[in-house]
Amino acid sequence: VLKDNKGKMLLLDAGIPIMKIKKGCSWKVSDIVGCVITHKHRDHSEAVSDLEEMGIPVYKPYEDNSYIGGYGEFKIVSVPMNDVHGRFKHTDADGTECPCYGFIIEHPEMGRMLYITDTEFVRWRFKDINHILVSCNYQKKYISEDVTGKRLHVIKGHMELETCAGFIEANTTNALQNVIICHLSANNAAPKEMVTRIKKVAGMANVDVAE
């Protein structure tokens, strides 16, 4: 959740039950100005229908990528997480492409934030970004060779630490204040090691792990 000084909130994905969202917002659902959804998978979109039934606008660029401008004082621009051929690397269970989008979110109190999750890489470069919230799912050294398909599931459509570090380095400027990594694999990531690695390429920015 992004919350401004007036108490207005923008939800970043909605992959938990609606009651947890309400509780997390201290039941002040009327202060939710909107929600952005990166892709259709349930762990990012579970509460979409509930939010829409409550009259809360939900931006789903994977269904309709028309420019919306933003919600409240939050200006929003979507960015497709595809390769140079237009293909999305994130997939559904059957292996078909799952369109996934990142977002540039701007607010007078915050500046410009980049939110990206569930992608193997980001081919874009961005200017004047103040905050980056990005998924850094796993470290190659912790991925064990197996034949169960779990290894492929972890790798497919998710970002490895060194790839993430390269992305951060390419987008680090004097404007960057914070880097927050999220969506860490429970069994294939060491948070402290990840933070240490990202700090080496993030300039003077603060680096932390999302709770």
Predicted regions and their residues:
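Metallo-beta-lactamase
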Residues: 50-110
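Glycine/Thr-rich phosphate-binding loops of Rossmann-like dinucleotide-binding domains
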Residues: 20, 45-46, 123, 141-142, ...
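Active-site metal-binding loops of divalent metal-dependent hydrolases
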Residues: 14-16, 40, 63, 81-83, ...
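A general structural motif
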Residues: 7, 29-32, 55, 110, ...
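Conserved beta-strand hairpin/beta-sheet module of binuclear metal-dependent hydrolase folds
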Residues: 1-25, 99-118, 131
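Cap/insert and terminal regions of metallo-dependent hydrolase folds
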Residues: 126-210
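Conserved catalytic scaffold of divalent metal-dependent phosphoesterases
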Residues: 69-83, 111-113, 119-121, 128-150
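Active-site metal-binding motif and surrounding structural segment of the metallo-beta-lactamase
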Residues: 8, 17-61
